[in-house]
């Protein structure tokens, strides 16, 4: 990694598999390096994958196979802006359909427990506007799991 700021994500043992999934799912994403452990470590043994360098939508990340001590939580999430329902559906279905879980308000978790916010731009634009339009869009969002772009647009119009 050459970036001065890299997100380090702790995985039990599947960092390489997760990184490959993210690279296949999101544009401007790739696995850039795989580093094997030079010796035994709490999550594995010499020769096992220790870290994986990758990008998600251009954001540099490192996956660390550290063992089961720490779990992902909603305290950290990737927010992915989408342009339309097709893009929203594609990302949501890839994450949830690959062993993930739906949550509320556009949030979901992948099979490794990492949280994602799949957020159509129409929603963030409405919330940024403030006022009655923001309140209507917010109220509509609060009833959803995956965000329905048509319903958000209808709420924006009143």
Question: Which positions does each model-derived feature cover?
Answer:
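Extracellular/periplasmic catalytic domains that process cell-envelope and extracellular macromolecules
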Residues: 1, 44-48, 55-56, 70-72, ...
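Short, solvent-exposed beta-strand edge segments and adjacent coil->beta transition regions
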Residues: 2-6, 73-77
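Short, small/polar residue-rich loop motifs at catalytic or cofactor-binding pockets
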Residues: 4, 48, 101-103
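Core segments of cupin and vicinal oxygen chelate
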Residues: 9-58
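Vicinal oxygen chelate
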Residues: 11, 25, 56-60, 71-72, ...
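A charge-rich, low-complexity, intrinsically flexible signal that marks solvent-exposed coils, linkers
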Residues: 41-43, 74-76, 157-158
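A short, polar/charged loop-to-alpha-helix boundary motif
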Residues: 122-140
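Acidic/histidine-enriched, glycine/proline-rich intrinsically disordered or flexible terminal extensions
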Residues: 134-158
């Amino acid at each position: 990694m050459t970036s001065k700021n890299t997100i380090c994500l702790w995985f039990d043992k599947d960092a390489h598999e997760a990184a490959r999934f993210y690279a296949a799912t999101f544009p401007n994403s790739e696995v850039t390096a795989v580093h094997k452990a030079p010796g035994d470590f709490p999550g594995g043994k010499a020769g096992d994958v220790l870290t994986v360098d990758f990008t998600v939508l251009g954001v540099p990340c490192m996956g660390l196979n550290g063992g089961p001590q720490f779990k992902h939580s909603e305290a950290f999430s990737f927010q992915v802006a989408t342009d339309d329902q097709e893009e929203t559906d594609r990302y949501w279905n890839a994450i949830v359909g690959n062993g993930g879980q739906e949550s509320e308000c556009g949030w979901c978790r992948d099979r490794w427990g990492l949280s994602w916010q799949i957020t159509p731009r129409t929603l963030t634009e409405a919330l940024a506007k403030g006022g009655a339009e923001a309140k209507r869009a917010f109220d509509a969002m609060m009833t959803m799991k995956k965000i329905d772009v048509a319903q958000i647009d209808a709420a924006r119009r009143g």
